[in-house]
Amino acid sequence: MPRKPSPVRFPNRLTLGIDEAGRGPAIGPMVMAAVAIDSRTAAILTRKGLRDSKAYGAGEDAHALRCDLAAEIRARAVFVATIEIEHTEIDARVCRGELNVLEREKATTLIEQAPTVDKIIADGKRMFAALGARFENFMSCDRAEDEHASVAAASVVAKALRDTRFEQIKRRYEDDCGPIAGGGYSNAATQRWLRTYVEKYKRLPEEARRTWPYPYVEDLIGDQRPPKIQTELFG
C-alpha cells in the first residue's frame, strides 16, 4: 500500500514589528516598541483579540484591556523592547526639525537589540523607508498595525506603557488642578486643564512639550516655546 505523502509544513516565520505611541500629545513622553513573534503566536494573539491599540478606545477599561493584552504579548513573544522618549528630548529634536530622524534612530536601536528575524515591519511608510537601505529584510507601510500582528502587538505594548506613564503624570496634578482629561493631546479637554494650571502657576507644567503650540494660554504666559522652532511635528 503506497505511503501517504507527508503534509506540507510551512515555516514558522519570525517577524519584528515596530510602532510608537504618544507622538502627538502635548504632555508626556513618546514610547516606541518592538515585538518579535512567530506566525503561530501571531495567530494565537489575533484569536485573543489583538488589534491596533487605538481600536480599543479610551478610558480606564480600554487601558486595562491593553495592559492585560500587553502582558500576554510579553509572555508569548520571542522579544519585546521599549524605549521611552522624554518630552525634553522630543523638544530638543523638534527644535532642529528632527522628530522623524529621532524616531528612525530609536527604531534602529530596537532592531539592533532584537534577535535575527525573517522580516522587520515598521508602521509609517515615509517615516521609516530609509531604514530599508540598512536592513535588507525591512519594510515600512502605513496602517501596518491593521495588517501585521507583530506591529499591532508593538502598538499595544507602546500604548499601554505610554498610558501608564501618563497616569503617573495625572496623579501628580490631580489634587491640585483636577484630572487631566483628553489623554494629554491638544484637544479641548487638555486645553481646559492646561488653562487651569497656567492660571494658577503662570507657566506650563514640567511635562508639557515646549515645542507644541499653546495659543490658548499665551495671553497668560506669552509664548514659552524655544526660539527658531522648525515645524516637523506630524510629517
Residue ranges of predicted features:
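RNase H-like, Mg2+-dependent phosphodiesterase core
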Residues: 1-235
